[in-house]
Each structure stands twice: as structure tokens, then as C-alpha cells.
Amino acid sequence: TDVRSLVEVNLLSVMALVDGALPALRKRGGGQLAIVSSLAAYYGLPATPTYCATKAGLKAYGTSLRGWLRSEHIRVSVILPGYVSSPMCAAMPGPKPFLWQPERAARRIRRGLALDRARISFPFPLNLGIWGLSLLPACLAMPIARMFGYDR
């Protein structure tokens, strides 16, 4: 099914790749892992529930790995981009506020990795808005999401 394939591609394949990379990272005495999630990890958008669920799973996985692997000198950063111009983004339903070009996103990610940030999220206004929605009770968050066009 589409649900199963999305979970396999977005979540399970990343977990398998990390699992496969860990022996080499341990052997060399450390390294860095960058796990790409999404700002959609913070608040489940009605139009893309499976996508949001997989990205929330990656966020939790990466955050857990960071603490687990720290003593082995393996750094882990979770990348939480908003909308980045791409064919995949263009095909997604709903508005795409604060759309970034890939080059700008790459610069932000590179800087965050160099600083060993736990989370690299952008753009700030969308990050703040989505994070804020996640703190509200559903009876308030859902009408706000609908107001911005995220109702399907």
C-alpha cells in the first residue's frame, strides 16, 4: 500500500542505513549523522498524515540517537526543513509559505552541521508557527491550520 511504502522509504530505510553505518563510525572512533525529517514532524497536517507520521518518527529517532551515541563521539543532527523548492514540494497539496531555494537550505544545513546542532530547522517563521500549533490543544490548533489552508 501507499502507507506501507511511505513508511518503508521515509522511516525504515533511514533506520536501516544508520544501523549499517554505525559499525564503520564506531571503528573510526566517531563521525556525524544527518537525518532529514521535516517541520511536518511537529504538527500533523490533515492532507499528509502518513508523511507527517514518518517525519515525526525520524525526529524522535534522531533525537534518541544523539543521546545514545554521544559517548561514542558520533554526532547526530536532525534536519527539519520547511518548504524547499523541488518537484516533490510542488506536488504536495496546500500552501507553501516561506518557500526556500535548495541552495539557501543547503547553506543553513551545512552551517548547522558544522556547529553540531541537535536540530537544524528553517525557515524561522514557519518553524515558530508549526511549533506553536503543536503546543495548542486541537480545538484551537485545527481552526488555525484551516485558516492558513491546511485543511486538506
Locations of the language-model features?
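Active-site-adjacent segment of SDR/Rossmann-fold oxidoreductases
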Residues: Y43, S64-R75
